[in-house]
C-alpha cells in the first residue's frame, strides 16, 4: 500500500493516491493488465469508491500526467520569470526541456504508454491532446499568444518537435540531458525555418534574437504573431 503512514482523507487526496498507485504499477505492467481493484488495494482505497473516483486505470494515469505537466510548467515559469531578457525561443526550449527532466524518472511508464498507444487509438489521442495542452501553456507562458489558426499551427509544430526529440530522450542517460538538449535545439531551428516559410510568424521578431550558438543569419528565428 502506498498510504501506510497516513491514509488520505478527502476525495481529492484519495483520487491523487489512486493516480499515484496506477502510475507506479504502470512502470512494470501493461496498462491493459492493471486492474482498478489492484490500484485501489495499493492505494488503500475501498474498491467501490475507487471506481467512483477514478473510473478507469487509464483516467487515473492521465490524471497523474496532468499533475506532472502542471508541476513542470509552473517550475519553468518560476525559472523564466526571473531570467531577465530571454528570447521567446529560449523560454520555449526551457519549458520543453524541463518537461523531459520532470519525466526522466518515469521512462518506464512512458515506454509502456507508447506501446499501449499503438494498440489503442483512443489512448494515443488522449496522450496527444494532453501534450498539445501543455505545449500551448509553454508557448503562452513564453510570450507567444498561440492565438488563431497560425497559433494552432505553431502549437502543433512544437508538438512535432517534442515528439521527435522524445526518441532521443528515451535513450539519453546523461545527467544534464545533453543529447536531448542538442536534438531539441536542432529541431526547433528546423521548425522555425518551416514556420517562416509558411508565414506563421510576423516580421517583428527583432526582440527575440537568438543566442550565441547560432550565426547572425539564424538569429531571432522565433517571432510572435499576435493575430
Region roles according to the model:
Residues 121-144, 152-164:
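Amphipathic alpha-helical packing segments from all-alpha helical-bundle domains
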